[in-house]
Amino acid sequence: MKIKTLAMIVVSALALSSTAALADTTTVNGGTVHFKGEVVNAACAVDAGSIDQTVQLGQVRSAKLATAGSTSSAVGFNIQLDDCDTTVATKASVAFAGTAIDSSNTTVLALQNSAAGSATNVGVQILDNTGTPLALNGATFSAATTLNDDPNIIPFQARYYATGAATAGIANADATFKVQYE
């Protein structure tokens, strides 16, 4: 009896496994993976986390930006340089480029234009580690930072800057940056 039961179990197991083995394989398209980067001939490489970053300036009351020259609290952000070779260069500085809000405020980034709901009379100002507002022409570099072998953190700050009585709305801005080694 035990042998008969064991034989039935073995036959059942084989039947189930052969059914699973004969099941159709299905393949579906999954998507696309984009790989982005750059090979550079420079003293350092910009850290991947610094290349496309977002600085959250948060919500600021329009009453705080009620007059020209008023600013919000500054928010810190960093540009990190990795894999530095101090025999190639010993210092690095950064320049930002973007659209200035107007010709009399060349250190204030214009806000992105959205269809409706943008704040007015306000822009974004970028400060270097000495607290100096940086021109947004892509040619005015921050104070130089002395490089170490690895890693190097170059600190900056960003804040809202009122050019008049700010009105409420979305207040986003973009700038690009480049690094100069010496």
From Swiss-Prot:
The protein's name in its UniProt record: Fimbrial subunit type 1
PANTHER family xrefs: FIMBRIAL SUBUNIT ELFA-RELATED (PTHR33420), FIMBRIN-LIKE PROTEIN FIMI-RELATED (PTHR33420:SF12)
Keyword DNA repair attached: no
Entry's Gene Ontology BP terms: cell adhesion involved in single-species biofilm formation
Transmembrane parts of this sequence: none
Signal peptide range in chain numbering: 1-23
Major localisation: other
GO cellular component entries: pilus
Subcellular location: Fimbrium
High-level lineage: Bacteria, Pseudomonadati, Pseudomonadota, Gammaproteobacteria, Enterobacterales
Pfam families: Fimbrial
Gene3D superfamilies, sorted: Fimbrial-type adhesion domain (2.60.40.1090)
SUPFAM superfamilies associated with the record: Bacterial adhesins
Keyword tags: Disulfide bond, Fimbrium, Signal
